[in-house]
Amino acid sequence: MHENMFFARTQQLSILEKRIRDLKDGYRQNIAIVGDEHVGKTSIIFKFLQQFCDNRIIPVYIEVRNETLACLCKRFIAVLLYNFLLNSEMPLKEDLEFLITKSSFYIPQTIEKIKALLHTLSKKKKDSVFTELLSLAESIHDETGKHCVIIFDEFHNLETTGVKKIFTEWAKILIVQKSTLYIIISSLKHKARGILSKDLSLLFGNFEIITIEPFDIKTSQDYLTSSLQSVTIHDALKNFIVNFTGGCPLYLTVISEMLTRSPQVSLVNILEELLFDSSGLLFQNFSNYVNRFQGSASKNEQLAILFMIADGHNKIKDIAHLLRKTKKELSSSINALLESDTITQSGDFLKTTDRVLGFWLKFVYQERLNSLTFDAKNQKALFRLKIDSLIQEFIATTKRPVSERMMELLHLFQDDQIQIERKKLRLNHFREVKFVEFKNCNLTDGLLCRSEDSIWVIAFKYDALTEEDIGEFAKECKKFRHKLQQKIIITFQDVDANSRLKALQEKIWTWDINNVNHVLDLFSKQRITVAQTALSAEPLRI
């Protein structure tokens, strides 16, 4: 983990701090932090623990691994006792027997329970061991008045300990434990939400879910500005990095660190080292990831689907056609990819969760598979050419007006269905898309789209959207006198609550830049970046 990877996330830290204060005041609200790999979930916890200081709270951070119950219990007890003794001013050792001996002077009853638990483990018994382990936190509270904050990182791995119905057992403890706060973390969003909605869905002791997303465009740009202060780099290349990484903190960090270490090295060279060279950090990471999909016919089918999506064939019906199978025959493999959070689904479309993985699959992994001789020199030159072409295409695209790019996108719609913020939307096949001007409205320019049975009216708002804007746009839409309308305002700034409510009342969609980029992703088009209208003028060195 990179120390400087932590950036922003102040809202999430504030929630954690508030929940700690609430715990001391007698109100316990457990927390579940979920998000894709590499988005910085653990870094939020580490930052919180780093700045946390309260003698009345004992933090217990446990990274849950694929290990036996005995190993988990011993690590848990060691961390619990070590952090309990941390403020005692005595020299400490990471030795379980030492920690038990020293703690026995302060919490004798808890130590007796620990010894009994370890004895049970030595007999290779598992019944009730996990619940006894978690009850140690309440025992310490009874003896000292101190609260424990137990953090299970990748908590879904608790299933590998061999305890039957471990989450059901845990739920029973959660109901009665009032003095212990649990924070659980998971990179498997689909699986975690399943556990939370089923086994850990409780009236008392339930979990507040905090979803960690990649950085948005502005935060990504702010991160690069902060981390590349000593590097002279064109704004267009910064925006390309934001687009390429999808705002993933790990990728932003790795690329910015390499640019800082070697400011004279081009971005193409850096991406080549990371993604193409066999010793590259991301090459090895993605190679290990792809190895999960080898060894059986079903795994091979999942990998074939992943290749299709990375290559731009991301409609389910198109994948079925190319693989010569029915959608029903592919459903189990698609569901497996969805459940592992390798891909996401939006209506009739699929896309890779990790943008950089998708690029690597298309331009590195598949190229190596399809090469008859694998001429390393030729493959490297081809890779560099594709990276360079991708950068040039991005820069050229971002210079075009947003309205023009949206018109191009709308012409690609073919009556497929997508999902935007949990709402389904049919992408009508338009026979006509044209520019319009709203003369009596602050939303001066827009698009009018006609299909066989409906019209879409789209307006663009480049500064803050107001309730007045929405009211005027609603009046403009009425001029078209068509019953079946989709009214959409595309805005490039945050929409305040009042404006959003007004839009709901007028049945107007408000799409922010994330919504638009979501649709662009589904059609393999370059994303829109906030700073695209203000690119710097220094010479561009790729």
Name these PLM-found stretches.
Residues 208-237, 243-244, 255:
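Conserved small helical "lid"/interfacial subdomain of P-loop NTPases
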Residues 253-327, 374-375, 379-382:
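Winged-helix-like regulatory helical subdomains adjacent to P-loop NTPase cores
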